[in-house]
Amino acid sequence: MLDKLQPLRGMKDLLPDDYKVHDYIINKARDVGVLYGYKQMSTPILEYTKVFNRSMGESSDIISKEIYSFLDKSNESVALRPEFTAGIIRSFISNNLRHKLPLKFFSTGPIFRYDRPQAGRQRQFHQLNYEYIGAKGAMTDAETLKLAVDILKALEIEQDTTLELNSLGCSESRSVYQQKLVEYLNDFKNQLSEESRVRLIKNPMRILDSKNEIDQKIVAAAPILSEYYTDESKEYFEDLIKYLNILGVKYRINPRLVRGLDYYCHTAFEFTTLKLGTQSTILAGGRYDGLAKIMGNNDDMPAIGFAAGIERIALMREYNVSLLSLVVVLPIGKNNICYALEIVDKLRTKNIATIIEPTGKIAKRMQRVLNENAKFIIFIGDEEQANNNLKLKDLETQEEYILDFAKTLELLKKY
């Protein structure tokens, strides 16, 4: 006997009920993005591994631990995308879109990371992604944050989230701060977790968001980045706060919130929740002016973006998404099937969602109808066929009607 085949660990099938909720979330988010001038685009799920190595750095957790990369049949190293931003900036460069700036892109689709599966964290998951390329100044950061708030409001979860905000300052601010941070952490080198000792050499700012309890106690007394802002960085953050206040965006400044990659600057943010346990981040992003140059552009390119996990959003609340009011046509006998097919086809051409249940005992067919959560059922027997009528039953009210096709269509169009 063959083994029962299962999906790979950490990868789940999206069944119709799941897809219904995913589609609802995507459509709501897309509609809000359109109001802000975002246009949908997509990049390949598979990219050259160097696209992500170059953008994220080989020492990052994603590249060193989580990326799905392998050699293809041409002996090229390729990878399933672990995030959207790198592929979108690669597309911006390879399609020579510089002359079309500014650009606002919305993307959605599957993301892959070899992570430890748990509730709210899978190895294949889906994201909403927004990138604003050519976004200059603190005002565009504030607008991006307001977009994120409006998306969460449209999805009816904004009230259960907190916007945590920080500024990473300019490169000069970070350089001075990183030196002071390393000096402080070196005194605790032997007490740090093994992972943080590695980060101390390769990416010390990442220690600030360590989940290790001992690391957290050490970090609690570490220098704070804002103490080393240049005048430019300080003014930028003050402008951002001013614009957010004007827009009515509520926030909590978190001086320990960082982005561990060199191309990030100024604004960094996360929307967190208490409803999902350890997987508390729903949406996160930041400004990444240095990424385009790292990936081959001639100069830095001002840009800001964020991503949100669809599966995590779906866990935040119960989405009772109703489909189109489904109509089921049930021919009573075999000699009624041809007429029933004509009716089904005519209803579909009028944009009425319709299925046909042509065979089997009436009781079993009725049970299948109920399982489909249909709104209406149309019975077609010899009498209805002879008189060119339809027997329509409203399954919610239990009301029945004998109508011709035109009257039936008129009634169905109301739902």
From Swiss-Prot:
<comment type="similarity">
    <text>Belongs to the class-II aminoacyl-tRNA synthetase family.</text>
</comment>
<keyword id="KW-0547">Nucleotide-binding</keyword>
<dbReference type="InterPro" id="IPR041715">
    <property type="entry name" value="HisRS-like_core"/>
</dbReference>
<dbReference type="Pfam" id="PF03129">
    <property type="entry name" value="HGTP_anticodon"/>
</dbReference>
<dbReference type="InterPro" id="IPR006195">
    <property type="entry name" value="aa-tRNA-synth_II"/>
</dbReference>
<dbReference type="InterPro" id="IPR004154">
    <property type="entry name" value="Anticodon-bd"/>
</dbReference>
<dbReference type="GO" id="GO:0005737">
    <property type="term" value="C:cytoplasm"/>
</dbReference>
<dbReference type="InterPro" id="IPR015807">
    <property type="entry name" value="His-tRNA-ligase"/>
</dbReference>
<keyword id="KW-0067">ATP-binding</keyword>
<dbReference type="InterPro" id="IPR036621">
    <property type="entry name" value="Anticodon-bd_dom_sf"/>
</dbReference>
<keyword id="KW-0648">Protein biosynthesis</keyword>
<dbReference type="InterPro" id="IPR033656">
    <property type="entry name" value="HisRS_anticodon"/>
</dbReference>
<dbReference type="GO" id="GO:0005524">
    <property type="term" value="F:ATP binding"/>
</dbReference>
<dbReference type="Pfam" id="PF13393">
    <property type="entry name" value="tRNA-synt_His"/>
</dbReference>
<dbReference type="InterPro" id="IPR004516">
    <property type="entry name" value="HisRS/HisZ"/>
</dbReference>
<protein>
    <recommendedName>
        <fullName>Histidine--tRNA ligase</fullName>
        <ecNumber>6.1.1.21</ecNumber>
    </recommendedName>
</protein>
<comment type="subunit">
    <text>Homodimer.</text>
</comment>
<keyword id="KW-0963">Cytoplasm</keyword>
<dbReference type="GO" id="GO:0006427">
    <property type="term" value="P:histidyl-tRNA aminoacylation"/>
</dbReference>
<keyword id="KW-0030">Aminoacyl-tRNA synthetase</keyword>
<dbReference type="InterPro" id="IPR045864">
    <property type="entry name" value="aa-tRNA-synth_II/BPL/LPL"/>
</dbReference>
<dbReference type="GO" id="GO:0004821">
    <property type="term" value="F:histidine-tRNA ligase activity"/>
</dbReference>
<keyword id="KW-0436">Ligase</keyword>
